Amino acid sequence: MISLVNDGRPRVMAHRGASYDRPENTAAAFAEARIQGADWVELDVRLSADGVLMVNHDAHYADGRPVRQVMACDAPADTLNLAEALEACEGMGVNVEVKNLPGELDHDASDLVCEAVAGLVGA
């Protein structure tokens, strides 16, 4: 179990990085979270068309394209894959939220996304 305090102070988790100051779920947001003293970062993952775990909150990118239908190499420029995000969050804990809701465009009834996250995080 993880302690909710660190050196006598509550642990701070940055939701999608420092998303008030930088674009959410980006390397800049994670770096700013570290600068601001975050202990943890929460981020969201979805599967791309070519099976890469991409860090994005919604089922669609901001430009309207569905994450599940876009190859990782064609994602918006500041979009990270999970491996890149974990590297950007080095030194902080990471809470990976798997977006897998029934009724959403990218719902994964076979839990392949969960298995992929577990495989990458456990590596």
State the predicted function of each range:
Residues 1-123:
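Phosphate-group recognition and catalysis centered on beta-loop-alpha active-site segments
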